[in-house]
Amino acid sequence: HPKIARWKAEPRLRRTSPISVFMAEAAEQALDSRHKKEERVGLVCALSTGSIIYSRKFFSGVLSQGRHFASPALFPETVYNSPVSHLAALFGIRGGCYTIVGDETAWVEALRIAQVWIARKTADVVLVIAGEELDALALDAYECAGWFRKGLVASEGAGAVLVRKAAEDSDGSIDISD
């Protein structure tokens, strides 16, 4: 897809895992130019497997050929926080950054953290983002955990929302716009 392919030209994302690319596009769509320049933007990320494709590649090399063949090019992407660090650098986010690793409810916890940060005036706006990449290992894990029996439809990609304090005259409802 052209919107995803353009991120491969970004030097910071040249060798990153797919989840970082998915999240970069979701962040780009959620942030407008005004928020990209704000000082107090926070970032909360929710995921369950992280960059599992690179993790599997890294550890399969270690297991099959020994620790001396562990690729230093792959290792940084095995850390759950790597997509968040890429996003913070790409978009100049200088506020708090946090990664939640969990099940399908991690997204709700990410929204709660954003709400707390805004209430405590830690951030003026918080980019809440969730993403996943698929791999046979992840699909096997979802099967073992019974997530498919609960109705999980596995997919890969990312989605993001920008959370901010409601206006004083707001009724507290959530407005979704294009």
Label for each model-derived stretch:
Residues H1, Y142-D178:
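Condensing-enzyme catalytic core mediating Claisen C-C bond formation in acyl metabolism
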Residues W7-E28, P72-P76, C97-R112, F148-G159, ...:
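Active-site pocket-shaping loop/turn-to-helix segments
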Residues H1-H86, L90-F91:
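Conserved beta-ketoacyl condensing-enzyme motif
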Residues T122-V126, A130-C144, K150, D178:
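Acyl-CoA/ACP chain-elongation machinery
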Residues L47-G50, D103-A106, A130-D135:
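Acidic, glycine-rich active-site loops and adjacent beta-strand->loop/helix elements
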Residues R40-C45, Y98-G102, A123-A130, S173-D178:
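Beta-strand segments within the central parallel beta-sheet cores of soluble alpha/beta enzyme folds
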Residues M23-S33, P83, L90-F91, C97-I129, ...:
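Active-site-proximal alpha-helical scaffold in enzymes
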Residues H1, L111-R112, L137-Y142:
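A short secondary-structure junction signal
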